[in-house]
Amino acid sequence: MKKLFGTDGVRGVANVYPMTTEMAMQIGRAAAYIFRNGKRRHRIVIGKDTRLSGYMIENALVAGICSMGVDVLQVGPLPTPGIANITSSMRADAGVVISASHNPFQDNGIKFFSRDGFKLPDEMELRIEELIFSGKIDSLRPIATEVGKAYRIDDAVGRFVVFLKSTFPKDLDLSGLKIVLDCANGAAYKVAPAVLEELGAEVIAIGVKPNGTNINAGCGSLYPNIISEAVKEHRADLGIALDGDADRVIFVDEFGHEVDGDHIMAICATDMLKQNKLRENTLVATVMSNMGLDIAVKKAGGRVIKTAVGDRYVVEEMQKGGYNLGGEQSGHMIFLDHNTTGDGVLSALQVLAVMQRHNKRLSELAEVMIPLPQVLVNVRVTEKRDVMTIPEVAGLIGDIEAKVKDEGRILIRYSGTEPLLRVMLEGQDKYQITGWAKEIAELVEKNIGGSEHG
């Protein structure tokens, strides 16, 4: 059982356990020891977003890594996917990202990439933890002549800009497009405007003045209303909003309407199917994706495979099946032909390429998917029992599933952080599925708790 690492590395409030400098140093020491392999010099890349606490955590990690005889390459503020890309392109042994993604500035996190740019498997994280808590690490220190050095890599932003531009079709550019871009005062504040401008777009950039405390503060992908208003005000062709570490992206069309991750996947998957570029004709999404996505992809001759929630599970499924496109409704998109992890700017470029190739507006492209009506009811529970072991609940769910068949679905799952059961239904008739969701919620409430409908 892991104590430190969650689904996306180690997370917490800065300067509070486990996000303290003491623990960051221990994580650095343990990781450096585990990534060492043979007698040669080893190197670990470290990058971060724009949080105030990034400085202290970075210095602690650097000290820990160097103390175990491994060199550090510091790239400064850079999108999470940029750190993955530079780790593999510079042939480092691992990459470290200091970020809490879309969380407020008070939070921070530490996550690792392996030398090939993929997130670490659970067993590697477990080995790092075991070494930290074993108390053995002090006996593994190298002698004074073997400690590591730290180097600053000054051209990391430029390297990543060049890489991103290389993923955009050579026969296209962005001239004639006016784009509102919200960088969330985060890690992409230099990279994203440079990429779009160098490809010929007129860019109205907001959220590009980080001060250490304004990352994700009323800006970025969690606040699409901000770019929606800006698109209408500037009469732009579309809006693009990234989150703090730029691993996810949300769009708004020329009318200011949000275009979420499901629509982006539908646009890209159907376009790749037409070009015979979607491997195995398969898109990988999560159980949270709307069934309208399945319908759109199936109509275009493809299929959708669903995983548990979390981009790491999407990537695992893609690697296992040899697929090249996956993502989440929240805006994490993985184009494995180009990069190894969710990449907001890269995803934006792929959508812009479809727009330019077909000379269509984003609102027209988004019509490829019609979302099914969706209803979500939360039930407060006293215990997280498998609801299918409650006969009357299981019976009702079975009856409803028989009625919706292929034209809807029921998704029932517990919240990972609260004592809530989430009952989600999709179907063609909003009135009907609302009634069914309430029926399920009432039976659950009767058996295992008190209700909070939302």
UniProtKB/Swiss-Prot annotation:
<dbReference type="InterPro" id="IPR050060">
    <property type="entry name" value="Phosphoglucosamine_mutase"/>
</dbReference>
<keyword id="KW-0413">Isomerase</keyword>
<keyword id="KW-0479">Metal-binding</keyword>
<keyword id="KW-0597">Phosphoprotein</keyword>
<dbReference type="InterPro" id="IPR005845">
    <property type="entry name" value="A-D-PHexomutase_a/b/a-II"/>
</dbReference>
<dbReference type="Pfam" id="PF02880">
    <property type="entry name" value="PGM_PMM_III"/>
</dbReference>
<dbReference type="GO" id="GO:0009252">
    <property type="term" value="P:peptidoglycan biosynthetic process"/>
</dbReference>
<dbReference type="GO" id="GO:0008966">
    <property type="term" value="F:phosphoglucosamine mutase activity"/>
</dbReference>
<dbReference type="Pfam" id="PF02879">
    <property type="entry name" value="PGM_PMM_II"/>
</dbReference>
<feature type="binding site" description="via phosphate group">
    <location>
        <position position="101"/>
    </location>
    <ligand>
        <name>Mg(2+)</name>
    </ligand>
</feature>
<feature type="active site" description="Phosphoserine intermediate">
    <location>
        <position position="101"/>
    </location>
</feature>
<feature type="modified residue" description="Phosphoserine">
    <location>
        <position position="101"/>
    </location>
</feature>
<dbReference type="InterPro" id="IPR016066">
    <property type="entry name" value="A-D-PHexomutase_CS"/>
</dbReference>
<dbReference type="InterPro" id="IPR005844">
    <property type="entry name" value="A-D-PHexomutase_a/b/a-I"/>
</dbReference>
<dbReference type="InterPro" id="IPR005843">
    <property type="entry name" value="A-D-PHexomutase_C"/>
</dbReference>
<dbReference type="GO" id="GO:0005829">
    <property type="term" value="C:cytosol"/>
</dbReference>
<dbReference type="InterPro" id="IPR006352">
    <property type="entry name" value="GlmM_bact"/>
</dbReference>
<dbReference type="InterPro" id="IPR005841">
    <property type="entry name" value="Alpha-D-phosphohexomutase_SF"/>
</dbReference>
<feature type="binding site">
    <location>
        <position position="243"/>
    </location>
    <ligand>
        <name>Mg(2+)</name>
    </ligand>
</feature>
<dbReference type="InterPro" id="IPR005846">
    <property type="entry name" value="A-D-PHexomutase_a/b/a-III"/>
</dbReference>
<dbReference type="InterPro" id="IPR036900">
    <property type="entry name" value="A-D-PHexomutase_C_sf"/>
</dbReference>
<dbReference type="InterPro" id="IPR016055">
    <property type="entry name" value="A-D-PHexomutase_a/b/a-I/II/III"/>
</dbReference>
<protein>
    <recommendedName>
        <fullName>Phosphoglucosamine mutase</fullName>
        <ecNumber>5.4.2.10</ecNumber>
    </recommendedName>
</protein>
<dbReference type="GO" id="GO:0004615">
    <property type="term" value="F:phosphomannomutase activity"/>
</dbReference>
<dbReference type="Pfam" id="PF02878">
    <property type="entry name" value="PGM_PMM_I"/>
</dbReference>
<keyword id="KW-0460">Magnesium</keyword>
<comment type="function">
    <text>Catalyzes the conversion of glucosamine-6-phosphate to glucosamine-1-phosphate.</text>
</comment>
<comment type="similarity">
    <text>Belongs to the phosphohexose mutase family.</text>
</comment>
<feature type="binding site">
    <location>
        <position position="245"/>
    </location>
    <ligand>
        <name>Mg(2+)</name>
    </ligand>
</feature>
<dbReference type="GO" id="GO:0000287">
    <property type="term" value="F:magnesium ion binding"/>
</dbReference>
<dbReference type="GO" id="GO:0006048">
    <property type="term" value="P:UDP-N-acetylglucosamine biosynthetic process"/>
</dbReference>
<feature type="binding site">
    <location>
        <position position="247"/>
    </location>
    <ligand>
        <name>Mg(2+)</name>
    </ligand>
</feature>
<dbReference type="Pfam" id="PF00408">
    <property type="entry name" value="PGM_PMM_IV"/>
</dbReference>
<dbReference type="GO" id="GO:0005975">
    <property type="term" value="P:carbohydrate metabolic process"/>
</dbReference>
